[in-house]
Amino acid sequence: MPTINQLVRKPRKSKVSKSKSPALNFGYNSMKKKATNNAAPQKRGVATRVGTMTPKKPNSALRKYARVRLSNLYEVTAYIPGIGHNLQEHSVVLIRGGRVKDLPGVRYHIIRGALDTAGVDGRMTSRSKYGTKAPKK
């Protein structure tokens, strides 16, 4: 337990919290070729690789992912939610933060129904999360 004199000389430091989606915290100025300090809720990028990976124990599946080069020149791995997708190399995608618990290193989600990513076909529930239009009556 510090004395009051010690606290006067050197106050307590507040904890610095680390971002869970660091690639969204920076922009890029292509004229100056420098990173800028403007954060964004989503970022646009180009898929450089699309594939599947297996989750950690005890789960078993083939989870779809895309490696994305963002507009700020960061390269990140993003999860493709929903059943089926139309993404391939050079597709333009929009990503948001949000990790996938059983895929190590996947901290971002691709937003379905935005840019080149199509919504999930035949989806009836939670349609807004998967970019699906309302069914015809």
UniProtKB/Swiss-Prot annotation:
Keywords: Methylation, Ribonucleoprotein, Ribosomal protein, RNA-binding, rRNA-binding, tRNA-binding. It comes from Leuconostoc mesenteroides subsp. mesenteroides (strain ATCC 8293 / DSM 20343 / BCRC 11652 / CCM 1803 / JCM 6124 / NCDO 523 / NBRC 100496 / NCIMB 8023 / NCTC 12954 / NRRL B-1118 / 37Y). CDD domains: Ribosomal_S12. This is Small ribosomal subunit protein uS12. It comes from the Bacteria. GO terms for cellular component: small ribosomal subunit. Residues 9-18 have a biased composition (Basic residues). With S4 and S5 plays an important role in translational accuracy. Interacts with and stabilizes bases of the 16S rRNA that are involved in tRNA selection in the A site and with the mRNA backbone. Located at the interface of the 30S and 50S subunits, it traverses the body of the 30S subunit contacting proteins on the other side and probably holding the rRNA structure together. The combined cluster of proteins S8, S12 and S17 appears to hold together the shoulder and platform of the 30S subunit.
